[in-house]
């Protein structure tokens, strides 16, 4: 990880231009410095003030347009000076090395004046410029060093000569660098250590880069890090040299041949102390950080256009990334994430994104830990319901960096308009939303939990404050793995447009409650009778004594009248996991909404779908066991 200029930074990574203001006492040579830079020779005649100079991006080392502004006390008012200070990104305070009065004015006038015009928490970076070094045999550094130690906003001090062009280009490079690669957010000179925000950002970067999660960066991980940040690999000897530097200074910076977090942080401290903080900034910006060490909105929320009637899903590359993320943190290889393993995974997040309800939204093991399938299901749910949140989460995990993609938007597939699916009588979607509707206590939550393979005994153990209104799991239809997302819709007289929007409707009534079916019938007539959304009626709690429903016709006759499949008997009160038949039917109806009601009532149609589900569930389990053996 050598200190170098590294990869070209993207436009969003740092400021689009730099504005440098030169101030100082009269006749210290401010204008001469600017004119010497532009003409590359000392001007014989110097005007009272130089016009604003713009240096194009292609001739500056950092490829950023730079504006250089001169200040003349003779030509400008105090108000104009204050305005220039407010517009500047960096200020060069120029003094003459042979003029003690101009040096004294640095602290008695200029620094206080500038600081009065800037916020205490975001001071402008300052460069002290000692001009006319050609006129003396000595250096002013002894006098200037205490000033630099007193004011942390001073980035550096440069002695130069406009007459013989000494350090002129270096002066403006340092000024530009002070804006693009500021020391302030990274390092505290008084404490001689990195600031907490910088340590936090670099720790996240280390954890993302530690792809096998063993607490060190091995040679392969260091080389990958070097390549994505600086566009160049490290030779084996260079890698060893880096580790030797760390070994020389701290005892626990290298372990098992890899760089530890302490070693990683030490290297960056060393870069900053040696004035090579552009190296640390290159790394920070590559991983999405701005000048305040916050992740940028451009990094977390890349542009993703989603037309109406389209949904969002994870693509194959995203699932591979999430599989590797799961494997990285499943340290005991039990195909489930314990609370500690999940906490470790979320250390790269600024907050814990999942609450206890997630454990009742997706599949868990007997300990209540999210399984491999449950982990992928939760990401699928987030992508479908709130794709911006999914992009944010993938950003925290470093998706675009580890997969070397432009952004995490490349992880998302935007499905085509549902109307096209209906016209073509086929769908490319893999996630289907089913709204589960019924009276309170009719058994809707039982249906949701049954999708996760939980019987009534297991459901009774769920705390009220941990309940979820969503459940998602995979279902096999005709040998294809699809995700079925169930949403429990609260009972109300009229449904909102958002509550109607789905691929299939599951209308649930309680066979033991005579008033239960009437609500399903009313909601169907109000919202779904004339729509193209397929509906399935589920007769829940079928293990209880069935009573006659207080409605004009029976549920069976109602289904026949409206050309729907007959009511599906369902119960969670089973010794093993509840039957998955209704979920296969719901997913099939969502996949094939154009299929005629006659086909839906055909036992052969359902047999083909269910047989495919059984075969692929068995195959899936076999592949799962094979995966375990490989791991």
Swiss-Prot record:
GO MF annotations, alphabetized: calcium ion binding; GTP binding; GTPase activity
Keywords from the named record: Acetylation, Calcium, GTP-binding, Hydrolase, Isopeptide bond, Magnesium, Membrane, Metal-binding, Mitochondrion, Mitochondrion outer membrane, Nucleotide-binding, Repeat, Transmembrane, Transmembrane helix, Ubl conjugation
Mitochondrial intermembrane side: 629-631
Keyword Acetylation in annotation: yes
Subcellular location: Mitochondrion outer membrane
Positions with a binding annotation for GTP 1: 27, 29-32, 72, 131-132, 134, 162-163
Residues at which Ca(2+) 2 binds: 330, 332, 334, 336, 341
Keyword Cell membrane: no
The protein, known as: Mitochondrial Rho GTPase 1
């Amino acid at each position: 990880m050598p200190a170098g200029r590294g990869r070209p930074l993207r436009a969003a990574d740092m400021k689009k231009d730099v504005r440098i203001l030169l101030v100082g006492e009269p006749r210290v040579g401010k204008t001469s410095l600017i004119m010497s830079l532009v003409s590359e020779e000392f001007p014989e005649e110097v005007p009272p003030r130089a016009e604003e100079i713009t240096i194009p991006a292609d001739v500056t080392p950092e490829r950023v347009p730079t504006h250089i502004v001169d200040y003349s006390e003779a030509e400008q008012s105090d108000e104009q000076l204050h305005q220039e200070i407010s517009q500047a990104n960096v200020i060069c305070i120029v003094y003459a090395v042979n003029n003690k009065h101009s040096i004294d004015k640095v602290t008695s006038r200029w620094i206080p004046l500038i600081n009065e015009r800037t916020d205490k928490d975001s001071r402008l970076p300052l460069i002290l410029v000692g001009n006319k070094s050609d006129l003396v045999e000595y250096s002013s550094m002894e006098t200037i060093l205490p000033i630099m130690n007193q004011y942390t906003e001073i980035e550096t001090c440069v002695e130069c000569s406009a007459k013989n062009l000494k350090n002129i280009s270096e002066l403006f490079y340092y000024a530009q660098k002070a804006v693009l690669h500021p020391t302030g957010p990274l390092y505290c000179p008084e404490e001689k250590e990195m600031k907490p925000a910088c340590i936090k950002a670099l720790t996240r970067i280390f954890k993302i880069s530690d792809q096998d999660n063993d607490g060190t960066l091995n040679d392969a991980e260091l080389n990958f890090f070097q390549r994505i940040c600086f566009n160049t690999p490290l030779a084996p000897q260079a890698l060893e040299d880096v580790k030797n530097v760390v070994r020389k200074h701290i005892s626990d910076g290298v372990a098992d041949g890899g760089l530890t977090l302490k070693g990683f942080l030490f290297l960056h401290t060393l870069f900053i102390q040696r004035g090579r903080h552009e190296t640390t900034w290159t790394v920070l910006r590559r991983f999405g950080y701005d000048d305040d060490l916050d992740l940028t909105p451009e990094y977390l929320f890349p542009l993703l256009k989603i037309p109406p009637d389209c949904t969002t899903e994870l693509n194959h590359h995203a699932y591979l990334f999430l599989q590797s993320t799961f494997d990285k943190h499943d340290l005991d290889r039990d195909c489930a994430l314990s609370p500690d393993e999940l906490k470790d995974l979320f250390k790269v997040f600024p907050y814990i994104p999942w609450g206890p309800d997630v454990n009742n939204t997706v599949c868990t093991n007997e300990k209540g830990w999210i399984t491999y399938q449950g982990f992928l299901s939760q990401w699928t749910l987030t992508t479908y319901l709130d794709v911006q949140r999914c992009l944010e989460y993938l950003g925290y995990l470093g998706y675009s960096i580890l997969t070397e993609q432009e952004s995490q938007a490349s992880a998302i597939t935007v499905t085509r308009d549902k109307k096209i699916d209906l016209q073509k009588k086929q769908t490319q979607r893999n996630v289907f939303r089913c709204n589960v509707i019924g009276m309170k206590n009719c058994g809707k939550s039982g249906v949701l939990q049954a999708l996760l393979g939980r019987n009534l005994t297991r459901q009774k153990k769920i705390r009220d404050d941990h309940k979820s209104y969503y459940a998602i799991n995979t279902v096999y239809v005709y040998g294809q793995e699809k995700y079925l997302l169930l949403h429990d819709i609260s009972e109300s007289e009229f449904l909102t447009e958002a509550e109607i929007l789905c691929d299939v409707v599951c209308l649930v009534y309680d066979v033991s409650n005579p008033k239960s079916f009437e609500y399903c019938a009313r909601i169907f007539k109000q919202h779904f009778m004339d729509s193209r959304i397929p509906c399935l009626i589920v007769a829940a709690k079928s293990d209880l004594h069935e009573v006659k429903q207080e409605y004009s016709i029976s549920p069976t006759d109602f289904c026949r009248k409206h050309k729907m499949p007959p009511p599906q008997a369902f119960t969670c009160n089973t010794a093993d996991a509840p039957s998955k038949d209704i979920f296969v039917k719901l997913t099939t109806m969502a996949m094939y909404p154009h299929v005629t009601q006659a086909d839906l009532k055909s036992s052969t149609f359902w047999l083909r779908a269910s047989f495919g589900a059984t075969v692929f569930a068995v195959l899936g389990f076999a592949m799962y066991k094979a995966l375990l053996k490989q791991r």
